[in-house]
């Protein structure tokens, strides 16, 4: 059998032509306060750095959520449909999904991620470890366009369980989070479920340390986005002319990650387009909203889902919510 036949199925639902994606990126950089969509963090190097972030002492979300899952895995699995289609949104290296396979016994694993090459290697590793399990990779900017109806309809007797761990939902503005969860709801039918992690409100010092670690890994991750922009736009950002900045905004209840210009300079963004940065000028790269448990339940309800079960840690730092169609 050829190597190609051994590889798991890989599909793409990317909708915008590359030129339109570039135009959106350029428009964000030309706003009065420049913006770069956080999806551009995740080139191959960015994925590697984020994996490193998840191992940091300061970055509590990963280990706290992992402990909640470890302590409650069987109880959570007992609330899920039998032999579901396990849909891992933003699956990365698929490590979190691997930990669920024995407990959930899915009929199929669907890994969804925007980083195509990284996704292919990740889903192939799952397929190699579980040769009897159907594994499908979907290259998708799923935060904007979730289009899995046809794929899920191939197995009408296996309802989907959407798995969205890691508090990534916090990267959306609350209204955008509602619209995103509504798109998940539209894929659930009557029996589908959403298993989602959300970071909870806590003291500012703990939050800020998680996004500005002493060893500088998060800073490297944030600065790497400029290398991605250079590749996408043929721009000439020099990352060394910016520094990482992360603070908690009390009014909006969110961490804000930015890049701050160290000095006045100019950047070529496109062939005939330049952007001038003054010293101290910011580029917004990420928001991470924090919720109380009740606020997040209300968000699920506004999105057409009912929270049926909730698990947290001893300190109430992180919440895992299981929701079904309302």
Predicted regions and their residues:
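Conserved class I S-adenosyl-L-methionine
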Residues: 83-92
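Conserved SAM-binding loop of SAM-dependent methyltransferases across substrates and taxa
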Residues: 93-105
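Conserved SAM/SAH-binding beta-strand->alpha-helix loop
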Residues: 115-116
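A short glycine-rich, Lys/Arg-flanked "PGG" loop and its adjoining helix->strand segment in the class I
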Residues: 178-190
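Conserved beta-strand signature within the Rossmann-like core of class I S-adenosyl-L-methionine
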Residues: 187-201
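Substrate-binding/catalytic lobe of Class I Rossmann-like enzymes that use SAM or dcSAM, i.e.
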Residues: 208-289, 297-303
């Amino acid at each position: 059998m050829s190597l190609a036949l051994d590889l798991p199925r890989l599909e793409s639902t990317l909708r915008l032509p590359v030129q339109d994606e570039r135009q959106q990126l350029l428009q964000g950089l030309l706003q009065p306060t420049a913006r770069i969509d956080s999806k551009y963090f995740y080139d191959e190097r960015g994925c590697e750095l984020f994996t490193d972030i998840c191992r940091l002492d300061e970055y509590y979300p990963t280990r706290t959520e992992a402990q909640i899952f470890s302590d409650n895995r069987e109880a959570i699995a007992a609330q899920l449909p039998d032999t579901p289609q396990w849909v891992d949104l933003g699956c990365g290296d698929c490590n979190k999904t691997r930990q669920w396979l024995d407990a959930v016994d899915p009929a199929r694993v669907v890994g969804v991620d925007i980083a195509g090459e990284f996704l292919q290697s990740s889903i192939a590793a799952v397929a190699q470890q579980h040769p009897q399990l159907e594994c499908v990779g979907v290259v998708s900017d799923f935060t904007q366009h979730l289009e899995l109806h046809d794929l899920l309809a191939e197995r009408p007797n296996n309802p989907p369980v959407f798995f969205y761990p890691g508090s990534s939902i916090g990267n959306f503005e609350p209204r955008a989070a509602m619209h995103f969860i509504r798109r998940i709801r539209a894929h659930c039918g009557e029996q589908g479920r959403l298993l989602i992690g959300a970071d909870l409100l806590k003291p500012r010092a703990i939050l800020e340390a998680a996004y500005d670690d002493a060893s500088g890994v998060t800073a490297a991750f944030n600065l790497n986005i400029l290398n991605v922009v250079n590749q996408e736009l043929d721009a000439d950002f020099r990352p060394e002319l910016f520094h990482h900045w992360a603070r908690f905004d009390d009014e909006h209840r969110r961490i804000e990650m930015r890049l701050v210009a160290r000095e006045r300079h100019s950047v070529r963004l496109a062939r005939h387009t330049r952007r001038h940065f003054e010293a101290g000028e910011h580029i917004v790269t990420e928001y991470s909203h924090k919720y109380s448990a009740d606020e997040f339940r209300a968000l699920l309800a506004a999105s057409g889902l009912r929270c049926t079960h909730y698990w947290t840690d001893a300190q109430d730092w992180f919440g895992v919510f299981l929701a079904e169609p309302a």
